């Protein structure tokens, strides 16, 4: 299991606003805002239960040592959801915030209930509920 996942985005404000609204639907909230005056920095999202957490960044956060460009290969990140209704809200709110549909809410392999979106930078994000 991982401790955290961090991804660099082109626009911290736009991506931060997007993830703040979408992740709230599945019980994940903004925990820390390290936005700098020049628009770079990072945001930490989580449930407040320590780990794992998700980092949205722009520019090069001081704790990263590699290139700060958004990836040319989109990421696929799946978030646990507390219910089917939360998956539905995640999908609906995401579409309203500018994401593209990459899979309507529904039953998937193994009996999970999931929905998929393409975020503002082309990453495939998913909300999954497993009963």
Which residues make up each language-model segment?
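Short glycine-enriched loop/turn motifs at secondary-structure junctions
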Residues: 1, 70-73, 108-109
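N-terminal beta-strand motif that seeds the catalytic metal site of vicinal oxygen chelate
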Residues: 1-16, 77, 131
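Conserved short beta-strand elements that form part of the metal-binding/catalytic scaffold
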Residues: 28-70, 125-129
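Vicinal oxygen chelate
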Residues: 44, 91-131
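Conserved beta-strand-loop-alpha-helix junction that forms the acyl-donor binding cleft
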Residues: 9-10, 37, 108-110
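Amphipathic alpha-helical segments
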Residues: 13-29
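Mid-chain, well-packed structural core segment of small domains
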Residues: 69-93, 97-99
